[in-house]
UniProtKB/Swiss-Prot annotation:
Function statement: Catalyzes the transfer of endogenously produced octanoic acid from octanoyl-acyl-carrier-protein onto the lipoyl domains of lipoate-dependent enzymes. Lipoyl-ACP can also act as a substrate although octanoyl-ACP is likely to be the physiological substrate.
NCBIfam families xref list: lipB, PRK14342.1
GO BP term, pick one: protein modification process
EC number per UniProt: 2.3.1.181
Binding site for substrate: R70, G71, G72, Q73, I74, T75, Y76, H77, S138, L139, G140, G151, L152, A153
Protein name from the UniProt record: Octanoyltransferase
Major site of localization recorded for this protein: cytoplasm
Length: 212
């Protein structure tokens, strides 16, 4: 297995532009293409999963709604949320299937939050990561030709109010939380968090990291 992982820090980006770049990357990659992680924040946007139900958008606003091809229902992205897109050839990894990749992503977040003294956990029937019953991280993947794209979105220090305009991930009344609810503002920083996410993800899947 090629155990090299390229990490790209992309800053603040338009959702649709990055989504199309992910699709292009996945469609054109071959057996020699290295796996990549894209770290990004997005301008405010609601994204609807491939099987998303329109009734989960409760209130229209000036925030655009984009139909996506990832799994899951509607969610919200905005600055102050660390998004980690996972562009991996699953076939390269012995004993790794889609469910195990989801578990690895959830454990990446659990281990990252533990470094801040936060006890978090996944739910078997509702992908993502939770703290005291509130959701702190959403997760949705798409698999094409045995390769993953899309990934996770971890709330760090953002305006959570627009989550009230939706049933987050299709769950009515689901409360959201973020890292800034539990730590000092200076620690609720996407750059600091992203380094921890990459460290734990690489350790879980046995990658060597190259940052671009």
């Amino acid at each position: 297995m090629n155990n090299s992982l390229i990490v790209r820090q992309l800053g603040l980006q338009d959702y649709q532009e990055i989504w199309h770049k992910m699709q292009d990357f996945t469609d054109t990659r071959n057996a020699e293409t290295q796996d990549e992680i894209w770290l990004v924040q997005h301008y405010p946007v609601f994204t609807q999963g491939q099987a998303g139900k329109p009734e989960h958008l409760l209130q229209r606003s000036e925030i655009p709604v984009v139909q996506s091809v990832r799994g899951g229902q509607i969610t919200y992205h905005a600055p102050g949320q660390q998004v980690m897109y996972v562009l991996i050839d699953i076939k390269r990894h012995k004993n790794l299937n889609v469910r195990q990749l989801v578990t690895a992503l959830e454990q990446t977040v659990v281990k990252t939050l533990a470094e801040y003294g936060i006890e978090s956990y996944p739910k078997p029937d509702a992908p993502g990561v939770y703290v005291d019953g509130k959701k702190i991280c959403s997760l949705g993947l798409r698999i094409r030709r045995g390769c993953s794209f899309h990934g996770l979105a971890l709330n760090i220090n953002m305006d959570l109010n627009p989550f009230h305009y939706i049933n987050p991930c299709g769950y009515a009344g689901l409360e959201m939380c973020q890292l800034a609810d539990f730590v000092n503002q200076d620690k609720a920083d996407c750059d600091n968090v992203s380094a921890k996410l990459i460290k734990h993800f690489a350790n879980l899947l046995g990658y060597n990291i190259t940052t671009l």
